[in-house]
Swiss-Prot record:
A Gene Ontology cellular-component term: plasma membrane
Alphabetic keyword roster: Cell inner membrane, Cell membrane, Membrane, Metal-binding, Transport, Zinc
Job description of the protein: Part of an energy-coupled inorganic carbon pump.
Protein topology in the membrane: Peripheral membrane protein
Protein name as annotated: Probable inorganic carbon transporter subunit DabA
Native source organism of the sequence: Azorhizobium caulinodans (strain ATCC 43989 / DSM 5975 / JCM 20966 / LMG 6465 / NBRC 14845 / NCIMB 13405 / ORS 571)
InterPro entries hit by this protein: DabA
Amino acid sequence: MLMTTPGSPLPSPDVLLEAANRAARAIPPLWPLASSVAVNPFLGQTGEPLATAASRLRRVAGIPLTMPRSWYADRLRSGEIAEEDLRAAFESAPAALRPKTFASLKRAVQSERPEPHAIPTLADLARDVAGIDWPAIVNDRISHWASSYFDEGQALWAKGQQGAAYSAWRIIATHDLTPEIAGLEGFAQSVADAPANAEDAIIACVARLGLCGPALESYFHRLLTTLGGWSQLARYRLWQAELTGNTDASVTDLLTIRLIWEAALLRKFGPVVEAQWKAAIAAYAEPVSATPEDVVDAILQEAAERAAQWRLGACLTGTSPARVADGRPTLQMAFCIDVRSEVFRRALESLDPGIRTLGFAGFFGLGIGHRRFGSDVVEARLPVLLKPGIFTCSGEATPAVTSSDLAARITARVERAWGRFKLAAISSFAFVEAAGPIYVAKLLRDGLGLKRHAAPNDPAPRPTSALDLDTRLTMAVSILKAMSLTRGFARLVLLAGHGANVVNNPHASALHCGACGGYSGEVNARLLASVLNDREVRADLAERGIIVPEDTLFLAALHDTTTDDVNIYAADHASAAHAEDVDQAERWLKSAGILARGERALRLPRAKQGQDIPHRARDWAELRPEWALAGCQAFIAAPRARTAGHDLAGRAFLHDYDWRRDDGFGVLELILTAPVVVASWISLQYYGSTVAPDVFGAGNKLLHNVTGGIGVVEGNGGLLRAGLPWQSVHDGERLTHEPLRLSVLIEAPREAIARILERHPEVRALFDNLWLHLFALDDKGRMAWRYTGDLQWETCVGDEHADEHSVREVA
């Protein structure tokens, strides 16, 4: 059946393909499990405010973007959200869209919003009239093919991976009789008759479906969301291709495949769904605009965030118990800004007044592509927004290291061959019968969590091509300035990357360092330590005004965020003169780990005391070995003195920054355009996985199966799941992550911040549309000014509401 009527103009190919491109870019990318990183699920909607994005995603995904109103009502009743917070959020909302009076807003809080429903696809309409779950059938057949096509080494017999996605799918679909058995006669033939070129196929399907120009983008977006993580994985391929100046058509190929299914269903069910389909097209063609209900929800969300901001401000201005000794520090230790470091840093500093800690992006400013010992795989250990500029490998280029590298490669090949033998279709049966008893001891050891996993300890990294002195010097100067570490060096300076230590966890890489692209951060830290210990670099640093004392030694370390153990790579730069310093540092780190584990045990289910935590890392059945970044609420770029000693409960990204040392505000620009953006991706992934877990969450860990080595499905099939598992945001009884958009606090002149936002419209959009909140701190560390959008600021509320807020618990 052809839905086009003589009076309905067919969109031009350019209009049609541009709509397909916009829909593709509205989908967030999904990184494979080997290097999974947090991704902002609203990446395609940051150019519009929350209320408008809620309207858009309700149409295309049938999801809310805020919590149920009862969640806000409970907090209003308890005083956690004060009436003043609600009033301030109400007054900041656009007058034309908000409720007419504050009283009407308060009444709206007591009534639950309507259940969100997506505009139907033809598969939805066919299900309703035929009683057959066509959306499930479509998703099942596409997933069955996609899990093989996108496979990255898990399948022993991968098939159909040659060529573009659309072409590969046509080869499989023309021989798949499942749709015809389900009742869609002639489907295989219709696929064979479809144009061989994906763009031509899109044009043909749009004509058959009778779509008008205004409906295209929303309809295309809707179809891509029905494919779950598969469309996000395809979007990742486009993202990666564009980093190197190329392109990839996988996501539009998936759209083409989904359109062919829609056209086939129209051919079958057109006469009985014609009226409903025309109504759906009209709904897709409607402009996206926020409804009054969307605006109410956005106001409630902002009120909750204002309440959290007040608690944060009260914490920062409270009396700090921190003791800071005058003179040269006894120990300096730089950590990643990751919120998990906040607990450990506070514990470490409490042990001695001479200990100073710093916060900096965990890749330490080194965008490297690293090849591990005995491997040819290049790991991009840097933020996913960037591409590697330096390539490194493990071990010096000596005969002994080369021989060890070769031996490691041979061992790895033998292990891979043995693994494939164990899993092969025929030999697997004989293997279990013959060799099963040999594995009893290993099974018991691993099952009981008796095996301990050592920290990564490859030979020290080195650039594959030697870096000249100017390059090394430039790196050292820029990184030390970015860390605000240009004077007052201790005898021992530790550079601590971080990683996780878990077993039986497909999402293990998501617990590693996001700034290192989902890998642990020790490689970057070890490389930076070697640069900063270089005598030639030290000499030239002095000429640049950065005087590093002769007796200062930089060493790398790795903070295990699961167990709070810290491993120092002292052998990289062995120094007899610093042996006692290293020993003392190890004692302090051990004590800090005990304190940090004790604090973390209070939040972890079934962890009664700190010593329970290390076993959780080795427990096959443990769903929550750590909370990762759950609870993240703030990003603070300021001198450590502003936050030292204040209990931020592991909820804040802490980046050391002193604007007085930042000539030209280049470091400030770097912070706003890199770490802040990465932190926003993390915060919004947790937000999306909490408020809309069905679409932006990975589902139930108990049901996860890895497919293709790239992602997880629930059970034995279905759509690829993206985002965070439910157990990462919920403890089984209540949410452990409070869904709040990140508050960014920066101690710097407002004019400098505004100039940077003006130069970076994509970053500015995050603040203008309130995907992030922005505050400027004054010289006393107070949240003095709030960014209100359009490069404007307002003075924050002072003490006039202190009585009302005093009823609330200060974090």
